[in-house]
């Protein structure tokens, strides 16, 4: 008896040549319904329609097509079970040997902004049911859920009877496919209706096995979405991205995004941003009237730490900028676009990883941030809210002048991306000293102020958290700091305010903290 394949696919890539091979090489009969049946019939492939096979018409506008005992009985019947054999004979079932199913494009539909009812109609019911039935009975039935599996299935079939390990692998991929599908639906409903869920479920396909993790003795894997984020970025040259590269690129790009992001020169004057990052901390940042100037200003902050770092831009990289980039050793450069001449200049550095990350590849706002802990996962909103300066409060007798306000705004945006406790010293829209990851705030201030040195005169200071004591203000005064920005909220805020008034320093409370761990 000829084997029977049930074929119902949304993604019709390679389905015609695959079905032809099944028929010509292995004498399969093809059972199909709806759009897939029409697609195959149009290609002159003989098809048994599901409605004829079950002797039941499609109903409810196509919502019910394959949900039938003749379909699921034919898939779920165990070939060596005597009771199953009797049921097959009694109910006149025909055994189905291969299930080829992929599902309605739910993710694509909702990503395109579909309305609620349209999205609901793109929730596949029959497809997942057939996939799960076949995967459960994988000892007797093979299940294919992706066009990438077709060729391998044909090759394995040519070897004779399919091995149990291969069929188990197909079952694993099938259950992962339906789990991914259900996850997309449940997360969409949660977000659309702004519901709190008792379970946190996400699904990411494997993108790549990385060479190693943070250290060579650690295994590492990269999972992610195919149509957004770093997996969709175009790597124009250089070695494969490492685990540490990806972490640093994420931090660097997140920082420059504070100042806008565009492939073309559409930024406001003096909003061309460049950030140099090392070990997940900015070691230099600037905004200026060109990408080239912004990079040079950022480099001045800490040229030693910049060696082997990551550089991010929020605008096109031109040849002037590329000339300066090629003069130092860098791991990666990321920007929304690159001039052809700039690429020619940078390509002399063959190991330099160059990434084009377009604006369209940026994730939507309001994503989640996760961290694993023993036996669990911590989930929070990402710290990407756009603050309104009108919500800030000047708490001192002296108000900051226009230039100081510009620098305070800049320093505050950079400080948000520095590991806590974080202090950033800025002047003329560039960082001149950064104190990162210290266990006490005054310690971070000492590092940042010492790094800036004599440049501190008339500079500003930003702190990601409040001052528990007035000692940071005293230290800032010793170096010539003229303005401070911090969240406020300490029980001893008044002591810091009084010290600022005594020393002639202006201070702003943002009323929002930006701890980063």
From Swiss-Prot:
<dbReference type="GO" id="GO:0005829">
    <property type="term" value="C:cytosol"/>
</dbReference>
<keyword id="KW-0511">Multifunctional enzyme</keyword>
<dbReference type="InterPro" id="IPR016193">
    <property type="entry name" value="Cytidine_deaminase-like"/>
</dbReference>
<dbReference type="InterPro" id="IPR036914">
    <property type="entry name" value="MGS-like_dom_sf"/>
</dbReference>
<keyword id="KW-0808">Transferase</keyword>
<dbReference type="Pfam" id="PF02142">
    <property type="entry name" value="MGS"/>
</dbReference>
<dbReference type="GO" id="GO:0003937">
    <property type="term" value="F:IMP cyclohydrolase activity"/>
</dbReference>
<dbReference type="GO" id="GO:0006189">
    <property type="term" value="P:'de novo' IMP biosynthetic process"/>
</dbReference>
<dbReference type="InterPro" id="IPR024051">
    <property type="entry name" value="AICAR_Tfase_dup_dom_sf"/>
</dbReference>
<comment type="similarity">
    <text>Belongs to the PurH family.</text>
</comment>
<dbReference type="InterPro" id="IPR002695">
    <property type="entry name" value="PurH-like"/>
</dbReference>
<keyword id="KW-0378">Hydrolase</keyword>
<comment type="pathway">
    <text>Purine metabolism; IMP biosynthesis via de novo pathway; 5-formamido-1-(5-phospho-D-ribosyl)imidazole-4-carboxamide from 5-amino-1-(5-phospho-D-ribosyl)imidazole-4-carboxamide (10-formyl THF route): step 1/1.</text>
</comment>
<keyword id="KW-0658">Purine biosynthesis</keyword>
<dbReference type="GO" id="GO:0004643">
    <property type="term" value="F:phosphoribosylaminoimidazolecarboxamide formyltransferase activity"/>
</dbReference>
<dbReference type="InterPro" id="IPR011607">
    <property type="entry name" value="MGS-like_dom"/>
</dbReference>
<dbReference type="Pfam" id="PF01808">
    <property type="entry name" value="AICARFT_IMPCHas"/>
</dbReference>
<feature type="domain" description="MGS-like">
    <location>
        <begin position="1"/>
        <end position="145"/>
    </location>
</feature>
<protein>
    <recommendedName>
        <fullName>Bifunctional purine biosynthesis protein PurH</fullName>
        <ecNumber>2.1.2.3</ecNumber>
        <ecNumber>3.5.4.10</ecNumber>
    </recommendedName>
</protein>
<comment type="pathway">
    <text>Purine metabolism; IMP biosynthesis via de novo pathway; IMP from 5-formamido-1-(5-phospho-D-ribosyl)imidazole-4-carboxamide: step 1/1.</text>
</comment>
